[in-house]
Amino acid sequence: MAEALAGFRPARRTPAEPMPLAGALHRVPAAPVTAPHALPGFARSTVDGYAVRAADTYGVSDGLPGYLQLTGAVLMGPVVIGTEPAITVRPGAAVSMPTGGVLPSGADAVVMIEYTQQVMAGTIEVVRPVAPGEGVVRADEDAAPGAGLVPAGRPLRAQDLAMLAAAGVTTVPVHARPRVTVFSTGDEVVPPEAVTLRPGQVRDASAVALAAMVAEAGGEPVPGGIVPDEPYALEAALRGALPASDLIVISAGSSVGTRDETAGVVRRLGPPGIWCHGIAIRPGKPTLLAECDGVPVIGLPGNPRSALVVFRLLGVPLVRLVGGCTMPPPEPAVRARLARDLPSAAGRLDVVQVQVTGGVATPLFGLSALLSVLTAADGYVIIPEEATGLDAGTEVEVTIYR
């Protein structure tokens, strides 16, 4: 399993496209974006107070205050915003400042109004010293010209959009959403809207959930439909999808039964072909990974629960990789103690669904065909390949479903 996670790295990446900020949330930048100019662009006050030369306040205290001549005020309002203050702070002088006001020339700090008082007309008393830069945001403190604002490969967050907007960047080059075609296979599979089921039929639950997971990972799900258990029908469907797909997902048919045709068909689609067929994971052992004519292909088990577990661990990273995401957001996780022993076999990675209450993780068990185990779970615990189980009371990391 570790080899599959680290070793299967298809070269395909979606191209870049320009995206206005209004539609850029969670999109993946195709190139770093740098600041076109300094931010905020001017030195400004972070407090209400007085702009001063810091050296004029050295040594002052409650018992030995200093006195400065009040020579003017920086104002805020539609008339003065956008213009430089026509005031210079000279030695022994101070200028009244509002929060956000442009620092006048000559000043290198702002003393908070709480540490001053006006003792007579044109004179203020200062009882606390300030250091250079105190109470001030430098002209390039948020970003210097040419500094990186957002990196390539990390999905854009709301705060990233705020930084770009502050810099006047209104369009970002982002990777196009990878088109992920999702096929279901099996004569027994019918659409979810089927009102009644004949004996042996099942509604296509996997395709609905897989499409949702593709969208969560930043992809564009494309329904491939339900393909019968007939190799030539599957081959025709896959060949038809290859030119318009960045990734193909095949639900069911990857096992070794007489009606499981995925591996044989994928071998004929194009080079380099199958990378691996069978992964040391439970559930999901018969998973297939391939690359055909530059398009990654993932074949999943037929049981919906197994398919969704494997796709979360292998398929979601593939969707992100093809979509240029090299810095995926961290999965939410909590630490909890196991409520009971978890047996496992060395050499196999086990994914165990759990409920978490009061810092205790209770394992949920059931047949791999049961979706109710997934819907009841708060998250999952991974038993690593080198372990032979985990004892009750062991502290584990639980990956929480979003």
Mark where each language-model region is.
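Short beta-strand segments
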Residues: 53, 96-98, 127, 151, ...
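Phosphate-interaction motifs
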Residues: 1-170
